[in-house]
Regions:
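Single conserved hydrophobic/aromatic residue that forms the stacking wall/gate
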Residues: 1-9
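Carbohydrate-binding/catalytic loop surfaces
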Residues: 6, 22-34, 66-73, 109-134, ...
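Well-ordered alpha-helical segments within folded domains of soluble proteins
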Residues: 16-32, 63-79, 134-150, 197-213, ...
Length: 287
């Protein structure tokens, strides 16, 4: 949390629009909900998000990692305050990233997966000629949809839009799971640095387990998929001393942070462990 807080205040304080800086706000909101006697805990993040809400700009989430870092905060403030403006702004920003950024948007509805940013939109191709769908990047969006759906009311006007995207992604992810239970860093090109990768796999397990538990995904269809992935991570990625292997380091595409191995130490491992723990929290809740 200290590291996230340093990131949150490193640039422009309450005036930042950067999702990197907003991310820690999710944790502060959760802490505030546990101990609401200290409003200072959310003062800064609320001021920053209110600034974003009260401006017409919607193009801040130009890379898909940002969807996970910032989008759930709007859902949390909408739930906390009961004000529709947070839900409306969240949808406007999500829709721009999804469908309008760089003209086509970042979401390929045909394939059910996301390009990481405009650098990877067509005509960019993987070595095998397929579009480039980075595993962890898609995992970030998948997790963001879960965290948003967990917060917004059942009658929120765009809830079904989020559900539809979640279901579309789920079908696409099911098709590209590896035989060993993991997902490759490149979801459509197993030859491009193919191999086990934990962070993306963990995010997919997190989302699928949540979907099964909440009745959005068919239990018979998706439970075997997510359990195969979870058991593979526990068996193959977790070291006896707790170190987590097969975690890709920082980057934005399959080639970054290579090689990814059982013993490789990523340059920033926090999110690998965090994704794994998120997956565990949802698998644990399954009955």
């Amino acid at each position: 949390l200290r590291r996230q807080r340093q990131m949150c205040i490193r640039d422009s304080g309450n005036t930042t629009r950067n999702a990197d800086d907003h991310c820690c706000g999710q944790t502060y909101i959760d802490l505030y909900n546990i101990c609401p006697s200290d409003p200072n805990m959310i003062r800064n993040i609320k001021a920053s998000i209110d600034m974003v809400v009260n401006t017409p700009q919607v193009n801040d989430w130009w890379w898909i990692d940002a969807v996970q870092m910032a989008m759930p905060i709007f859902a949390k403030f909408g739930k906390m305050t009961g004000e529709q403006k947070y839900y409306d702004k969240m949808w406007d920003m999500y829709y721009y990233t999804r469908s309008q950024h760089d003209e086509t948007g970042m979401f390929n509805q045909k394939d059910g997966l996301w390009w990481r940013d405009q650098d990877f939109n067509p005509p960019y191709k993987e070595p095998n000629g397929e579009d480039c769908y980075w595993s962890r990047g898609n995992g970030w969006v998948y997790a963001a949809l879960v965290r948003v759906l967990d917060e917004i009311p059942s009658d929120e006007k765009h809830r079904q839009d989020y559900v539809n995207d979640f279901l579309t992604m789920s079908k696409a992810l099911k098709k590209c799971q590896r035989e060993d239970g993991f997902w490759n860093v490149s979801l459509h090109d197993p030859t491009n640095f193919g191999g086990k990768e934990t962070s993306g796999t963990a995010l997919f397990v997190y989302g699928m387990a949540w979907g099964v538990r909440n009745g959005l995904l068919d239990r018979k269809e998706y439970l075997p998929i997510l359990l195969k992935a979870w058991n593979a991570m526990v068996k193959d990625a977790v070291h006896p001393n707790g170190f987590l292997g097969y975690v890709q380091g920082t980057g934005k595409e399959p080639k970054d942070g290579q090689p990814v191995t059982y013993k490789s130490v990523p340059d920033f491992e926090d999110y690998g462990v965090g994704c794994f723990l998120l997956a565990g929290t949802e698998v644990y809740k399954l009955k």
